[in-house]
Amino acid sequence: MQDKLVWIDCEMTGLRLGTDKLIEIAALVTDSELNVLGEGVDIVIHADDDALAAMPDVVTKMHENSGLTDEVRKSTVTLAEAEQQVLAYIREHVPVAGTAPLAGNSIATDRGFIARDMPDLDTYLHYRMIDVSSIKELSRRWYPRIYFGQPEKGLAHRALADIRESIRELKYYRKTAFVPEPGPSTSDIAAVVEELGPA
């Protein structure tokens, strides 16, 4: 595995993997220091009126307010075309399949839709995932000041904006919740392992 991270966010007509449609996907690749590589991609995918009409009320309002619903109607991009565009961008920065983990916020939901609709993209990514929401949940339990002090998130509910927010959020946790660089000494690490005892 290499140090780069593939950040993906999807917008869907809902969260039901059995029936809802993937209507927007964005991707950014970062290095291990969370610097964005390249311009990234943000693709709106066409869905028919029946799929849009089946959205739950809260999702309907969210996508109408963001302008996504109108863009979905106007888009002529298919799932297969979107998948190839995302893969082309990722391959520029991650030339070997299976080496970079997927990163994002509550990323398992996105991964489910990617696995269903974009199998080539799914298999190009490493099976491991870095979920910023896991760090958020641990911070809430262990470091509530960090949790409650986190920067406010925007409410764009658009894929590329959501990725940028996730990267910003992980930068925040890195500076507040993780051990400062260069990290613990070898002897400090050994002491923690000894304290934990055998498995």
Swiss-Prot record:
SMART domains: EXOIII
Keywords: Cytoplasm, Exonuclease, Hydrolase, Nuclease
Family to which this protein belongs: Belongs to the oligoribonuclease family.
Alphabetical list of Gene3D superfamilies matching this protein: Ribonuclease H-like superfamily/Ribonuclease H
Highest taxon of source: Bacteria
Classification via NCBIfam families: PRK05359.1
Active-site annotation: 127
Subcellular location: Cytoplasm
Function: 3'-to-5' exoribonuclease specific for small oligoribonucleotides.
EC code(s) of this entry: 3.1.15.-
Protein name per Swiss-Prot or TrEMBL: Oligoribonuclease
One GO cellular component, as annotated: cytoplasm
The keyword Cytoplasm appears for this protein: yes
Molecular-function GO terms, alphabetical: 3'-5'-RNA exonuclease activity; nucleic acid binding
Domain Exonuclease: from-to ranges: 5-170
Source organism of this protein record: Rhodococcus jostii (strain RHA1)
Enzyme class, first EC level, given as a word: hydrolase
Gene responsible for this protein: orn
